[in-house]
Amino acid sequence: MSKLVLILNCGSSSLKFAILDPATGEEKLSGLAEAFFLPEARIKWKLNGEKGNADLGAGAAHTEALNFIASNILTDELKNSIAAIGHRIVHGGEKYTQSVIVTDEVVKGIEDAAQFAPLHNPAHLIGIREAFNAFPHLKDKNVVVFDTAFHQTMSEEAFLYALPYSLYKEHGVRRYGAHGTSHYFISREVAEYVGKPADQVNAIICHLGNGGSVSVVRNGQCIDTSMGLTPLEGLVMGTRCGDIDPAIVFYLYKTLGMSMEQIEETLVKKSGLLGLTEVTSDCRYAEDNYDNASKPEAKRALNVYSYRLAKYIGAYMAVLGDDHLDAIAFTGGIGENSAHVRELALNHLKLFGIKIDNERNLAARFGKDGVITTDDSAFKAIVLPTNEELVIAQDTARLCF
Protein backbone atom coordinates (compact mmCIF):
# COMPACT_ATOMS: atom_id res chain seq x y z
CA MET A 1 0.00 0.00 0.00
CA SER A 2 1.27 3.48 -0.87
CA LYS A 3 1.91 6.27 1.63
CA LEU A 4 -1.35 7.60 3.05
CA VAL A 5 -2.37 10.76 4.90
CA LEU A 6 -4.69 10.90 7.91
CA ILE A 7 -6.75 14.10 7.77
CA LEU A 8 -8.23 15.61 10.92
CA ASN A 9 -10.74 18.44 11.15
CA CYS A 10 -11.39 19.11 14.82
CA GLY A 11 -14.33 21.19 15.93
CA SER A 12 -15.23 22.15 19.46
CA SER A 13 -17.67 19.23 19.76
CA SER A 14 -16.84 17.03 16.79
CA LEU A 15 -14.03 15.47 14.78
CA LYS A 16 -14.16 14.74 11.06
CA PHE A 17 -11.51 12.33 9.83
CA ALA A 18 -10.39 10.68 6.62
CA ILE A 19 -7.50 8.74 5.15
CA LEU A 20 -6.52 9.53 1.57
CA ASP A 21 -3.94 8.44 -0.94
CA PRO A 22 -2.54 11.83 -2.00
CA ALA A 23 -1.25 10.40 -5.27
CA THR A 24 -4.58 9.08 -6.53
CA GLY A 25 -7.12 10.89 -4.36
CA GLU A 26 -8.60 7.54 -3.31
CA GLU A 27 -10.39 7.73 0.03
CA LYS A 28 -9.66 4.73 2.23
CA LEU A 29 -11.56 5.87 5.31
CA SER A 30 -13.96 8.65 6.25
CA GLY A 31 -15.89 9.34 9.40
CA LEU A 32 -17.29 11.67 12.01
CA ALA A 33 -17.15 11.65 15.79
CA GLU A 34 -19.70 13.99 17.34
CA ALA A 35 -21.70 15.04 20.40
CA PHE A 36 -18.51 15.42 22.45
CA PHE A 37 -18.93 15.96 26.21
CA LEU A 38 -22.52 14.69 26.01
CA PRO A 39 -24.03 11.37 27.10
CA GLU A 40 -24.65 10.42 23.46
CA ALA A 41 -21.06 10.93 22.21
CA ARG A 42 -20.68 8.68 19.18
CA ILE A 43 -18.61 7.88 16.11
CA LYS A 44 -19.50 6.66 12.61
CA TRP A 45 -17.23 5.71 9.74
CA LYS A 46 -16.92 4.14 6.31
CA LEU A 47 -13.95 1.85 5.65
CA ASN A 48 -13.49 0.09 2.30
CA GLY A 49 -17.17 0.60 1.53
CA GLU A 50 -18.33 -0.85 4.85
CA LYS A 51 -20.16 1.43 7.29
CA GLY A 52 -19.80 1.25 11.06
CA ASN A 53 -20.82 3.17 14.16
CA ALA A 54 -20.26 3.02 17.90
CA ASP A 55 -20.90 4.85 21.14
CA LEU A 56 -17.81 6.54 22.54
CA GLY A 57 -19.12 6.68 26.09
CA ALA A 58 -20.76 9.49 28.03
CA GLY A 59 -18.65 12.63 28.05
CA ALA A 60 -16.16 11.35 25.48
CA ALA A 61 -14.27 13.90 23.37
CA HIS A 62 -11.24 14.23 21.08
CA THR A 63 -8.95 11.92 23.07
CA GLU A 64 -11.42 9.05 23.14
CA ALA A 65 -12.32 9.55 19.47
CA LEU A 66 -8.72 9.41 18.24
CA ASN A 67 -7.92 6.46 20.48
CA PHE A 68 -10.98 4.65 19.12
CA ILE A 69 -9.91 5.37 15.54
CA ALA A 70 -6.38 4.09 16.18
CA SER A 71 -7.39 1.03 18.20
CA ASN A 72 -10.75 -0.07 16.80
CA ILE A 73 -11.16 1.19 13.24
CA LEU A 74 -7.74 1.11 11.60
CA THR A 75 -6.44 -2.21 10.36
CA ASP A 76 -2.75 -2.91 10.95
CA GLU A 77 -2.09 -2.51 7.23
CA LEU A 78 -3.85 0.84 7.10
CA LYS A 79 -2.22 2.08 10.29
CA ASN A 80 1.24 1.17 8.98
CA SER A 81 0.53 2.99 5.72
CA ILE A 82 -0.24 6.33 7.39
CA ALA A 83 2.89 8.36 6.70
CA ALA A 84 1.69 11.80 7.83
CA ILE A 85 -1.22 13.68 9.40
CA GLY A 86 -2.85 16.79 7.94
CA HIS A 87 -4.88 19.19 10.08
CA ARG A 88 -7.41 21.75 8.87
CA ILE A 89 -6.93 25.09 10.67
CA VAL A 90 -9.59 27.78 10.29
CA HIS A 91 -7.45 30.84 11.04
CA GLY A 92 -3.75 31.48 10.54
CA GLY A 93 -3.80 35.26 10.76
CA GLU A 94 -1.35 37.13 8.53
CA LYS A 95 1.57 34.95 9.47
CA TYR A 96 0.80 31.88 7.38
CA THR A 97 0.43 32.10 3.63
CA GLN A 98 0.86 28.38 3.02
CA SER A 99 0.76 25.01 4.76
CA VAL A 100 3.57 24.22 7.23
CA ILE A 101 4.86 21.36 9.36
CA VAL A 102 3.81 21.67 13.00
CA THR A 103 6.46 23.09 15.34
CA ASP A 104 6.25 24.81 18.72
CA GLU A 105 6.36 28.14 16.88
CA VAL A 106 3.47 27.12 14.63
CA VAL A 107 1.41 26.05 17.65
CA LYS A 108 2.05 29.50 19.15
CA GLY A 109 0.90 31.12 15.90
CA ILE A 110 -2.34 29.15 15.94
CA GLU A 111 -2.88 30.18 19.56
CA ASP A 112 -2.32 33.84 18.66
CA ALA A 113 -4.86 33.64 15.82
CA ALA A 114 -7.44 32.04 18.12
CA GLN A 115 -8.73 35.51 19.05
CA PHE A 116 -10.27 35.62 15.55
CA ALA A 117 -11.55 32.01 15.66
CA PRO A 118 -12.26 31.32 19.34
CA LEU A 119 -14.44 28.28 18.67
CA HIS A 120 -12.25 26.66 16.05
CA ASN A 121 -8.53 27.25 16.69
CA PRO A 122 -8.49 25.92 20.28
CA ALA A 123 -10.23 22.77 19.04
CA HIS A 124 -7.65 22.40 16.25
CA LEU A 125 -4.87 22.60 18.85
CA ILE A 126 -6.53 19.81 20.83
CA GLY A 127 -6.53 17.74 17.64
CA ILE A 128 -2.83 18.35 17.09
CA ARG A 129 -1.98 17.42 20.67
CA GLU A 130 -4.10 14.27 20.60
CA ALA A 131 -2.64 13.25 17.23
CA PHE A 132 0.82 13.46 18.80
CA ASN A 133 -0.37 11.15 21.58
CA ALA A 134 -2.21 8.65 19.37
CA PHE A 135 0.50 8.51 16.68
CA PRO A 136 3.77 9.40 18.48
CA HIS A 137 5.94 8.03 15.65
CA LEU A 138 4.47 10.70 13.33
CA LYS A 139 5.07 13.68 15.62
CA ASP A 140 7.34 15.39 13.07
CA LYS A 141 4.97 14.50 10.22
CA ASN A 142 2.01 16.69 11.23
CA VAL A 143 1.06 19.46 8.80
CA VAL A 144 -1.41 22.32 9.25
CA VAL A 145 -3.39 23.67 6.29
CA PHE A 146 -4.94 27.10 6.87
CA ASP A 147 -8.36 28.19 5.59
CA THR A 148 -7.04 31.76 5.47
CA ALA A 149 -3.83 31.08 3.51
CA PHE A 150 -5.24 31.31 -0.03
CA HIS A 151 -6.61 34.79 0.68
CA GLN A 152 -3.28 36.25 1.80
CA THR A 153 -2.62 37.51 -1.75
CA MET A 154 -5.28 40.23 -1.31
CA SER A 155 -4.03 43.80 -1.56
CA GLU A 156 -4.56 46.43 1.13
CA GLU A 157 -7.43 47.99 -0.79
CA ALA A 158 -9.29 44.69 -0.48
CA PHE A 159 -8.38 43.58 3.03
CA LEU A 160 -8.40 46.88 4.96
CA TYR A 161 -11.48 48.19 6.76
CA ALA A 162 -12.11 51.95 6.89
CA LEU A 163 -11.26 51.98 10.59
CA PRO A 164 -8.34 53.68 12.35
CA TYR A 165 -5.26 52.22 10.67
CA SER A 166 -3.74 51.51 14.08
CA LEU A 167 -6.36 48.80 14.65
CA TYR A 168 -4.81 46.91 11.77
CA LYS A 169 -1.16 47.61 12.56
CA GLU A 170 -1.43 46.98 16.29
CA HIS A 171 -4.23 44.42 16.52
CA GLY A 172 -4.50 42.76 13.12
CA VAL A 173 -8.05 43.94 12.42
CA ARG A 174 -8.50 43.29 8.68
CA ARG A 175 -10.20 40.95 6.22
CA TYR A 176 -8.83 37.40 6.33
CA GLY A 177 -11.50 35.30 4.64
CA ALA A 178 -12.20 31.61 5.06
CA HIS A 179 -12.89 28.45 3.01
CA GLY A 180 -9.55 29.15 1.33
CA THR A 181 -8.72 25.48 0.83
CA SER A 182 -11.94 24.99 -1.12
CA HIS A 183 -11.50 28.20 -3.12
CA TYR A 184 -7.95 27.12 -4.02
CA PHE A 185 -9.10 23.68 -5.14
CA ILE A 186 -11.96 25.04 -7.25
CA SER A 187 -9.73 27.66 -8.89
CA ARG A 188 -7.55 24.78 -10.13
CA GLU A 189 -10.61 22.83 -11.25
CA VAL A 190 -11.87 25.84 -13.22
CA ALA A 191 -8.48 26.14 -14.92
CA GLU A 192 -8.64 22.50 -15.97
CA TYR A 193 -12.25 22.88 -17.10
CA VAL A 194 -11.55 25.84 -19.36
CA GLY A 195 -8.15 24.59 -20.54
CA LYS A 196 -5.92 27.29 -19.02
CA PRO A 197 -2.85 27.12 -16.77
CA ALA A 198 -3.80 27.54 -13.11
CA ASP A 199 -1.77 30.75 -12.84
CA GLN A 200 -3.76 32.35 -15.67
CA VAL A 201 -7.32 31.57 -14.61
CA ASN A 202 -9.79 34.30 -13.63
CA ALA A 203 -12.83 33.09 -11.72
CA ILE A 204 -15.53 33.95 -9.21
CA ILE A 205 -15.99 31.06 -6.80
CA CYS A 206 -19.12 30.59 -4.69
CA HIS A 207 -18.61 28.14 -1.82
CA LEU A 208 -22.12 27.67 -0.48
CA GLY A 209 -22.82 25.40 2.48
CA ASN A 210 -24.07 26.05 5.99
CA GLY A 211 -21.35 28.68 5.87
CA GLY A 212 -20.84 30.49 2.60
CA SER A 213 -18.30 32.73 0.91
CA VAL A 214 -17.44 34.14 -2.50
CA SER A 215 -13.95 34.86 -3.75
CA VAL A 216 -12.60 36.43 -6.91
CA VAL A 217 -9.45 35.00 -8.44
CA ARG A 218 -7.15 36.76 -10.91
CA ASN A 219 -4.30 34.82 -12.51
CA GLY A 220 -4.82 32.01 -10.01
CA GLN A 221 -4.58 34.25 -6.94
CA CYS A 222 -7.33 35.51 -4.65
CA ILE A 223 -7.84 39.27 -4.89
CA ASP A 224 -10.95 39.58 -2.70
CA THR A 225 -13.32 37.46 -0.64
CA SER A 226 -16.59 38.00 1.19
CA MET A 227 -15.75 36.75 4.69
CA GLY A 228 -13.87 39.19 6.86
CA LEU A 229 -12.02 39.35 10.15
CA THR A 230 -14.18 36.36 11.06
CA PRO A 231 -16.49 34.04 9.07
CA LEU A 232 -19.50 36.18 10.09
CA GLU A 233 -19.19 38.74 7.29
CA GLY A 234 -20.54 38.40 3.77
CA LEU A 235 -23.28 36.15 2.49
CA VAL A 236 -26.48 35.06 4.19
CA MET A 237 -25.61 31.68 5.74
CA GLY A 238 -27.38 28.92 7.61
CA THR A 239 -27.39 30.67 10.99
CA ARG A 240 -25.00 33.60 10.39
CA CYS A 241 -26.27 37.01 9.32
CA GLY A 242 -23.49 38.02 6.95
CA ASP A 243 -23.34 41.72 6.05
CA ILE A 244 -25.34 44.03 8.32
CA ASP A 245 -25.21 47.68 9.36
CA PRO A 246 -22.76 47.64 12.32
CA ALA A 247 -25.04 50.09 14.14
CA ILE A 248 -27.55 47.27 14.55
CA VAL A 249 -25.26 46.03 17.33
CA PHE A 250 -25.59 49.39 19.12
CA TYR A 251 -29.37 49.27 18.71
CA LEU A 252 -29.64 45.75 20.11
CA TYR A 253 -27.42 46.69 23.04
CA LYS A 254 -28.67 50.17 23.93
CA THR A 255 -32.31 50.09 22.91
CA LEU A 256 -33.32 46.45 23.30
CA GLY A 257 -31.06 45.85 26.28
CA MET A 258 -29.41 42.72 24.91
CA SER A 259 -26.07 41.68 26.38
CA MET A 260 -23.02 41.30 24.13
CA GLU A 261 -23.29 37.52 24.59
CA GLN A 262 -26.92 37.60 23.45
CA ILE A 263 -26.05 39.77 20.46
CA GLU A 264 -23.23 37.45 19.44
CA GLU A 265 -25.49 34.42 19.73
CA THR A 266 -28.15 36.19 17.65
CA LEU A 267 -25.79 37.15 14.82
CA VAL A 268 -23.88 33.85 14.74
CA LYS A 269 -26.44 31.20 15.68
CA LYS A 270 -29.94 32.64 15.22
CA SER A 271 -29.74 34.61 11.97
CA GLY A 272 -29.23 33.71 8.31
CA LEU A 273 -31.74 31.27 6.86
CA LEU A 274 -32.79 30.29 10.37
CA GLY A 275 -33.56 33.89 11.25
CA LEU A 276 -35.38 34.62 8.00
CA THR A 277 -37.55 31.50 8.12
CA GLU A 278 -37.80 31.32 11.92
CA VAL A 279 -38.03 27.57 11.27
CA THR A 280 -34.73 26.07 10.15
CA SER A 281 -31.24 26.77 8.83
CA ASP A 282 -31.69 24.08 6.15
CA CYS A 283 -31.80 25.57 2.67
CA ARG A 284 -33.83 22.60 1.45
CA TYR A 285 -36.82 23.74 3.51
CA ALA A 286 -36.78 27.11 1.72
CA GLU A 287 -36.49 25.39 -1.67
CA ASP A 288 -39.17 22.78 -1.04
CA ASN A 289 -41.67 25.37 0.19
CA TYR A 290 -40.72 28.24 -2.12
CA ASP A 291 -44.09 28.28 -3.90
CA ASN A 292 -46.13 27.27 -0.85
CA ALA A 293 -48.37 30.25 -0.10
CA SER A 294 -48.92 29.02 3.45
CA LYS A 295 -45.18 29.22 4.16
CA PRO A 296 -44.12 32.68 2.90
CA GLU A 297 -40.99 32.52 5.04
CA ALA A 298 -39.47 30.03 2.58
CA LYS A 299 -39.62 32.38 -0.42
CA ARG A 300 -38.54 35.31 1.74
CA ALA A 301 -35.44 33.49 2.95
CA LEU A 302 -34.37 32.11 -0.42
CA ASN A 303 -34.90 35.44 -2.17
CA VAL A 304 -32.76 37.32 0.37
CA TYR A 305 -30.11 34.58 0.22
CA SER A 306 -29.90 34.61 -3.58
CA TYR A 307 -30.05 38.41 -3.86
CA ARG A 308 -27.07 38.80 -1.51
CA LEU A 309 -25.16 36.17 -3.48
CA ALA A 310 -25.88 37.95 -6.77
CA LYS A 311 -24.65 41.26 -5.32
CA TYR A 312 -21.29 39.73 -4.48
CA ILE A 313 -20.92 38.04 -7.86
CA GLY A 314 -21.73 41.31 -9.63
CA ALA A 315 -19.34 43.29 -7.46
CA TYR A 316 -16.53 40.84 -8.13
CA MET A 317 -17.16 40.96 -11.87
CA ALA A 318 -16.53 44.70 -11.59
CA VAL A 319 -13.37 44.10 -9.54
CA LEU A 320 -11.88 41.98 -12.34
CA GLY A 321 -12.07 45.02 -14.62
CA ASP A 322 -10.58 44.36 -18.04
CA ASP A 323 -9.53 40.81 -17.17
CA HIS A 324 -11.66 38.17 -18.87
CA LEU A 325 -13.81 36.14 -16.48
CA ASP A 326 -13.32 32.47 -17.32
CA ALA A 327 -16.14 31.17 -15.15
CA ILE A 328 -18.43 31.59 -12.17
CA ALA A 329 -18.11 28.40 -10.14
CA PHE A 330 -20.57 26.98 -7.61
CA THR A 331 -19.45 24.48 -4.98
CA GLY A 332 -20.28 23.31 -1.44
CA GLY A 333 -23.43 21.50 -0.33
CA ILE A 334 -25.82 24.22 -1.54
CA GLY A 335 -23.69 25.36 -4.46
CA GLU A 336 -23.41 21.83 -5.84
CA ASN A 337 -27.00 20.74 -5.25
CA SER A 338 -29.36 23.71 -5.28
CA ALA A 339 -30.33 24.45 -8.86
CA HIS A 340 -32.92 26.86 -7.47
CA VAL A 341 -30.39 29.05 -5.67
CA ARG A 342 -28.13 29.13 -8.73
CA GLU A 343 -31.07 30.08 -10.96
CA LEU A 344 -32.30 32.85 -8.67
CA ALA A 345 -28.82 34.33 -8.26
CA LEU A 346 -27.81 34.20 -11.93
CA ASN A 347 -31.14 35.66 -13.07
CA HIS A 348 -30.16 38.85 -11.22
CA LEU A 349 -27.11 39.09 -13.51
CA LYS A 350 -28.78 39.29 -16.92
CA LEU A 351 -27.29 42.76 -17.35
CA PHE A 352 -23.91 41.03 -17.76
CA GLY A 353 -25.25 38.77 -20.50
CA ILE A 354 -25.40 35.67 -18.31
CA LYS A 355 -28.00 33.16 -19.50
CA ILE A 356 -28.81 30.07 -17.47
CA ASP A 357 -29.76 26.81 -19.20
CA ASN A 358 -32.51 25.20 -17.12
CA GLU A 359 -31.87 21.62 -18.27
CA ARG A 360 -28.13 21.87 -17.68
CA ASN A 361 -28.73 23.50 -14.32
CA LEU A 362 -31.01 20.68 -13.15
CA ALA A 363 -28.58 18.04 -14.43
CA ALA A 364 -25.61 19.45 -12.49
CA ARG A 365 -26.55 18.16 -9.04
CA PHE A 366 -25.78 15.35 -6.61
CA GLY A 367 -22.10 15.00 -7.42
CA LYS A 368 -22.35 15.80 -11.13
CA ASP A 369 -20.35 18.74 -12.46
CA GLY A 370 -21.07 20.74 -15.57
CA VAL A 371 -21.65 24.06 -17.30
CA ILE A 372 -25.10 25.42 -16.42
CA THR A 373 -25.25 28.39 -18.81
CA THR A 374 -26.29 28.48 -22.46
CA ASP A 375 -23.78 28.31 -25.29
CA ASP A 376 -24.41 31.98 -26.10
CA SER A 377 -24.10 33.18 -22.49
CA ALA A 378 -21.54 35.97 -22.13
CA PHE A 379 -19.90 34.08 -19.26
CA LYS A 380 -19.80 30.45 -18.18
CA ALA A 381 -21.24 29.27 -14.88
CA ILE A 382 -20.01 25.86 -13.75
CA VAL A 383 -20.90 23.48 -10.93
CA LEU A 384 -17.81 21.80 -9.48
CA PRO A 385 -17.70 19.49 -6.42
CA THR A 386 -15.02 20.58 -3.96
CA ASN A 387 -12.46 18.34 -2.27
CA GLU A 388 -10.76 20.10 0.62
CA GLU A 389 -9.49 16.79 2.00
CA LEU A 390 -7.51 16.14 -1.17
CA VAL A 391 -5.80 19.54 -0.92
CA ILE A 392 -4.88 18.83 2.70
CA ALA A 393 -3.57 15.38 1.76
CA GLN A 394 -1.51 16.70 -1.14
CA ASP A 395 -0.05 19.59 0.86
CA THR A 396 0.83 17.21 3.68
CA ALA A 397 2.48 14.78 1.27
CA ARG A 398 4.42 17.59 -0.41
CA LEU A 399 5.93 18.64 2.92
CA CYS A 400 6.48 15.19 4.43
CA PHE A 401 7.12 12.61 1.70
Curated annotation (Swiss-Prot):
It is an enzyme of class 2 (transferase). Substrate binds at R88. One of its GO terms (cellular component) is cytosol. Mg(2+) binds at N9, E388. Its EC number is 2.7.2.1. It is found in: Cytoplasm. GO terms for biological process: acetate metabolic process; acetyl-CoA biosynthetic process. ATP binds at K16, H207, L208, G209, N210, G211, D282, C283, R284, G333, I334, G335, E336, N337. The record marks H179, R240 as: Transition state stabilizer. Its cofactor is Mg(2+); Mn(2+). Pfam families: Acetate_kinase. Its main location: cytoplasm. CDD domains: ASKHA_NBD_AcK_PK (cd24010). HAMAP family: Acetate_kinase. Belongs to the acetokinase family. This is Acetate kinase. It comes from Haemophilus influenzae (strain 86-028NP). The lineage of its organism: Bacteria, Pseudomonadati, Pseudomonadota, Gammaproteobacteria, Pasteurellales.
